[in-house]
Protein backbone atom coordinates (compact mmCIF):
# COMPACT_ATOMS: atom_id res chain seq x y z
CA UNK A 1 0.00 0.00 0.00
CA UNK A 2 1.07 3.53 -0.69
CA UNK A 3 1.57 5.81 2.31
CA UNK A 4 -1.59 7.80 2.97
CA UNK A 5 -3.60 5.58 0.62
CA UNK A 6 -6.76 4.12 2.06
CA UNK A 7 -7.61 0.53 1.31
CA UNK A 8 -10.86 -0.41 -0.37
CA UNK A 9 -12.64 -1.29 2.89
CA UNK A 10 -12.06 1.98 4.76
CA UNK A 11 -12.65 4.06 1.64
CA UNK A 12 -15.93 2.28 0.96
CA UNK A 13 -17.12 2.59 4.59
CA UNK A 14 -16.70 6.36 4.39
CA UNK A 15 -19.35 6.50 1.68
CA UNK A 16 -22.18 5.58 4.05
CA UNK A 17 -21.62 8.50 6.43
CA UNK A 18 -20.93 10.93 3.62
CA UNK A 19 -23.99 9.84 1.65
CA UNK A 20 -26.15 10.18 4.75
CA UNK A 21 -24.83 13.68 5.35
CA UNK A 22 -25.69 14.61 1.74
CA UNK A 23 -29.17 13.12 2.02
CA UNK A 24 -29.85 14.98 5.27
CA UNK A 25 -28.77 18.27 3.65
CA UNK A 26 -31.08 17.59 0.69
CA UNK A 27 -33.93 16.74 3.08
CA UNK A 28 -33.45 20.05 4.87
CA UNK A 29 -33.46 21.89 1.53
CA UNK A 30 -36.74 20.25 0.44
CA UNK A 31 -38.41 20.92 3.80
CA UNK A 32 -37.29 24.56 3.71
CA UNK A 33 -38.50 24.93 0.12
CA UNK A 34 -41.95 23.57 1.03
CA UNK A 35 -42.15 25.76 4.12
CA UNK A 36 -41.11 28.80 2.08
CA UNK A 37 -43.78 28.18 -0.55
CA UNK A 38 -46.42 27.85 2.16
CA UNK A 39 -45.15 30.81 4.17
CA UNK A 40 -45.64 33.01 1.10
CA UNK A 41 -49.32 32.03 1.34
CA UNK A 42 -49.54 32.90 5.04
CA UNK A 43 -49.13 29.33 6.34
CA UNK A 44 -46.44 28.95 8.99
CA UNK A 45 -47.36 25.81 10.94
CA UNK A 46 -47.05 23.03 8.33
CA UNK A 47 -44.45 20.34 9.09
CA UNK A 48 -43.56 18.37 5.91
CA UNK A 49 -41.78 15.64 7.90
CA UNK A 50 -44.91 14.54 9.78
CA UNK A 51 -46.50 11.33 8.55
CA UNK A 52 -49.78 13.01 7.64
CA UNK A 53 -48.16 15.53 5.29
CA UNK A 54 -50.32 14.64 2.26
CA UNK A 55 -53.60 14.82 4.19
CA UNK A 56 -52.59 18.11 5.78
CA UNK A 57 -51.68 19.54 2.37
CA UNK A 58 -55.21 18.83 1.13
CA UNK A 59 -56.73 20.57 4.15
CA UNK A 60 -54.49 23.66 4.09
CA UNK A 61 -55.96 27.11 3.58
CA UNK A 62 -54.07 30.31 2.85
CA UNK A 63 -53.73 32.98 5.50
CA UNK A 64 -56.92 34.65 4.27
CA UNK A 65 -58.93 31.40 4.20
CA UNK A 66 -58.78 30.49 0.49
CA UNK A 67 -57.76 27.01 -0.71
CA UNK A 68 -54.20 26.66 -1.99
CA UNK A 69 -53.78 27.61 -5.67
CA UNK A 70 -53.88 24.57 -7.98
CA UNK A 71 -50.36 24.81 -9.40
CA UNK A 72 -48.83 25.64 -6.03
CA UNK A 73 -50.43 22.54 -4.55
CA UNK A 74 -49.09 20.50 -7.50
CA UNK A 75 -45.58 21.92 -7.01
CA UNK A 76 -45.67 21.13 -3.29
CA UNK A 77 -46.91 17.63 -4.13
CA UNK A 78 -43.88 17.08 -6.36
CA UNK A 79 -41.61 18.41 -3.60
CA UNK A 80 -43.24 15.92 -1.23
CA UNK A 81 -42.56 13.14 -3.77
CA UNK A 82 -38.87 14.05 -3.75
CA UNK A 83 -38.87 14.38 0.05
CA UNK A 84 -40.44 10.94 0.48
CA UNK A 85 -37.86 9.43 -1.89
CA UNK A 86 -35.11 11.02 0.22
CA UNK A 87 -36.66 9.65 3.41
CA UNK A 88 -36.67 6.14 1.92
CA UNK A 89 -33.05 6.50 0.82
CA UNK A 90 -32.12 7.73 4.30
CA UNK A 91 -33.76 4.66 5.85
CA UNK A 92 -31.80 2.41 3.48
CA UNK A 93 -28.45 4.08 4.22
CA UNK A 94 -29.10 4.04 7.97
CA UNK A 95 -30.06 0.34 7.83
CA UNK A 96 -26.80 -0.44 6.00
CA UNK A 97 -24.84 1.59 8.54
CA UNK A 98 -26.56 -0.12 11.48
CA UNK A 99 -25.90 -3.56 9.97
CA UNK A 100 -22.22 -2.68 9.67
CA UNK A 101 -22.09 -1.70 13.36
CA UNK A 102 -23.91 -4.82 14.63
CA UNK A 103 -21.99 -6.61 17.41
CA UNK A 104 -22.25 -9.86 15.43
CA UNK A 105 -20.56 -8.30 12.38
CA UNK A 106 -16.99 -9.55 11.93
CA UNK A 107 -15.94 -6.45 9.95
CA UNK A 108 -16.29 -4.00 12.85
CA UNK A 109 -13.26 -4.04 15.18
CA UNK A 110 -13.59 -4.48 18.93
CA UNK A 111 -13.00 -0.75 19.58
CA UNK A 112 -15.94 0.19 17.35
CA UNK A 113 -18.19 -2.33 19.07
CA UNK A 114 -17.15 -0.92 22.46
CA UNK A 115 -17.76 2.64 21.26
CA UNK A 116 -21.22 1.71 19.98
CA UNK A 117 -22.05 0.29 23.41
CA UNK A 118 -21.39 3.56 25.24
CA UNK A 119 -24.36 5.54 26.47
CA UNK A 120 -24.75 8.84 24.64
CA UNK A 121 -22.84 7.71 21.54
CA UNK A 122 -25.24 6.98 18.73
CA UNK A 123 -24.81 4.91 15.60
CA UNK A 124 -24.13 7.93 13.36
CA UNK A 125 -21.30 9.23 15.54
CA UNK A 126 -19.84 5.74 15.93
CA UNK A 127 -19.94 5.11 12.19
CA UNK A 128 -18.45 8.53 11.45
CA UNK A 129 -15.57 8.02 13.89
CA UNK A 130 -14.86 4.55 12.53
CA UNK A 131 -15.03 5.52 8.88
CA UNK A 132 -13.10 8.77 9.18
CA UNK A 133 -10.37 8.17 11.75
CA UNK A 134 -10.38 5.00 13.87
CA UNK A 135 -8.86 2.85 11.12
CA UNK A 136 -5.81 5.15 10.92
CA UNK A 137 -2.74 4.55 13.05
CA UNK A 138 -1.50 7.58 14.93
CA UNK A 139 1.94 7.56 16.54
CA UNK A 140 1.15 10.02 19.31
CA UNK A 141 -1.51 12.31 20.71
CA UNK A 142 -0.24 15.31 18.74
CA UNK A 143 -1.06 13.53 15.49
CA UNK A 144 -4.56 12.77 16.76
CA UNK A 145 -5.07 16.39 17.82
CA UNK A 146 -3.79 17.69 14.48
CA UNK A 147 -6.04 15.30 12.57
CA UNK A 148 -9.04 16.45 14.59
CA UNK A 149 -8.10 20.12 14.14
CA UNK A 150 -7.26 20.60 17.80
CA UNK A 151 -3.62 21.57 17.33
CA UNK A 152 -2.56 24.83 19.00
CA UNK A 153 -1.73 27.84 16.83
CA UNK A 154 1.16 29.81 18.28
CA UNK A 155 1.80 33.43 17.29
CA UNK A 156 5.16 35.13 17.70
CA UNK A 157 6.36 38.65 16.96
CA UNK A 158 9.78 39.55 18.27
CA UNK A 159 9.86 38.59 21.92
CA UNK A 160 6.05 38.43 22.20
CA UNK A 161 4.58 34.94 22.09
CA UNK A 162 0.88 34.07 22.30
CA UNK A 163 -1.37 31.11 21.74
CA UNK A 164 -4.08 32.11 19.30
CA UNK A 165 -6.30 29.22 20.24
CA UNK A 166 -7.13 26.02 18.47
CA UNK A 167 -6.57 25.47 14.77
CA UNK A 168 -9.60 24.63 12.64
CA UNK A 169 -7.52 22.97 9.94
CA UNK A 170 -8.25 19.33 10.75
CA UNK A 171 -10.69 16.93 9.15
CA UNK A 172 -14.07 18.72 9.27
CA UNK A 173 -15.94 15.44 9.54
Predicted regions and their residues:
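A charged, well-structured terminal subsegment
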Residues: 1-6
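Short capping/connector residues at structural and topological boundaries
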Residues: 7-10, 54, 62-65, 143, ...
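Glycine-rich, often acidic, oxyanion-interacting loops/wings at catalytic, nucleic-acid
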Residues: 8-114
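Phosphate-backbone recognition surface of nucleic-acid-processing proteins
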Residues: 111-173
Amino acid sequence: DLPGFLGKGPQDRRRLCRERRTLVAERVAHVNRIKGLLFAQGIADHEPLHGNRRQRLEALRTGDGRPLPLYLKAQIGRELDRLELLLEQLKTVEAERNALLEPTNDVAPVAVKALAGLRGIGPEFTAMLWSECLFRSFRNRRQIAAYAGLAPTPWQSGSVRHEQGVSKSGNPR
